[in-house]
């Protein structure tokens, strides 16, 4: 029996939580926010270069950082995925959506940690909304990265590679070591 998208996302989230703790220990959310901002920038760059390979890689990396952020925040990515939505009426316009999202991620992460302008809970809710929008965007872009592609199919392919990396044993090149087997 095939697993649903939500079941598979939950499974990857559990696996990623264990992998992240093993490789990096307990991390802070702002580090994942920085990683997510970096990867969204790579999505925009891949789009502008019209590079399907780079788009595929960056979408998968966005997913990995989102999983890690969700694990730290205590959120379930499948729930956010099922409630994914555009941020505004122009949500599918690329690459223009990236800069406002990156700014909003930085804003809500910073203000939430400072507990100002609405407090930590307000900014956490805003971040959840941003994640739902990012998931909407990544799902839409996945079909551009690979014919018939979905966010889940790209995340699974990326996770298959990333999960083999041991950053404790190979802190300078775990990606290369894992790829060369």
Predicted features, each with a name:
Residues 1-181:
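Flexible "arm" and connector segments at domain edges
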